[in-house]
Amino acid sequence: MKANHRIFLVLTILIALGCEHSAAQEKKLPNIVILATGGTIAGAAATGTQAAYTSGAVTIDAMLAAVPGIKDLANIKGEQISNVGSQDMTLDIMLTLAKRINGLLAQPEVDGIVVTHGTDTMEETAFFLNLAVKSEKPVVLVGSMRPSTAVSADGPLNLFDAVGVAVDPNSAGRGVLVVMNDWIHGAHSLTKTSTTAIQTFMSPLRGLVGVSSYGKNDFYNRPQWTHTTASEFDISNVTRLPRVDILYAYADMAADLIDASVANGAHGIVIAGVGNGNMNKASLEAAARAAQKGVVVVRSSRVVTGTVGRNVEVNDDQMNFVASDELNPQKARILLMLALLKPRTTGEIQNLFYTY
């Protein structure tokens, strides 16, 4: 009996030590929080080859279950912020997301954030977070072009790589990142370029920040624009962002679109201009009238790459316009909304476009 009792005690001690060792090993892993917002990565279709699907149909727990080995990279917790297709992403959700990220990253035990997001408006949310997050810890957005039920779905590996980037110390201080199909992009430069191809995101002006392969990363570029902790924008007490409209320029553009935007309460207007941010004479005159009424007019371009220069084809000084520099229309809108949270001159807003 005594021998059996001693054996029992030894086994109990060994089991306890094993549990402590396992717990210690678990604690050594970085702590990552995945914030889910919906999108194709959480989408589901009736069959594996069906193009039509329902966005945001899969929960964060189900997504994690579909990624073997992901929990070997980090201790992962998941939260559902929203569950929408990104065409339905709202400014309210963006504000909620940014505030939650700031709250989580203020906790010493949280090492990084991964946000699952639809690709349609991912670049807008990424750029917003790049200006609103107040931490150098990694924040990584990830999505997919194929739903979770598709043959050769791209979401699981994208999510694995995103967590791999989030746990990498070399990701810190680079601003908000986007990981899609082995590529690591900075929030300032990336844009969606294809409606269907899985390699849809490109960074045409500044190039990739790095590459990721099965959780292994190679960084070779650092974002050159002001972001996160160096950003002057504070959304901690912001509940609503000013209305800013985007108007698309085209041959024989109807100038009354600009007048209608002003009449409906826009505080700012971004023109997705032709070429170097240009528009026809009637629209230029309407935009000048809007600027005279205190509406901030930003000239961007509908062209995928290139910069919009100040006083190049349009006399911005005379018309009191802002040139978007490198920002495409959708990102110019994000920056302008944040700029309008407090009174600024047109010159001050122009400097923001040279900074962010």
Residue ranges and their predicted role:
Residues 8-18:
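Bacterial N-terminal signal peptides
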Residues 29, 35, 59, 63-70, ...:
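Accessory alpha-helical/coil subdomains and C-terminal extensions
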Residues 126-157, 163-167, 292-301:
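Short, acidic/small-residue loops that bind anionic groups at enzyme active sites
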Residues 276-356:
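C-terminal non-catalytic interaction/assembly regions of soluble proteins
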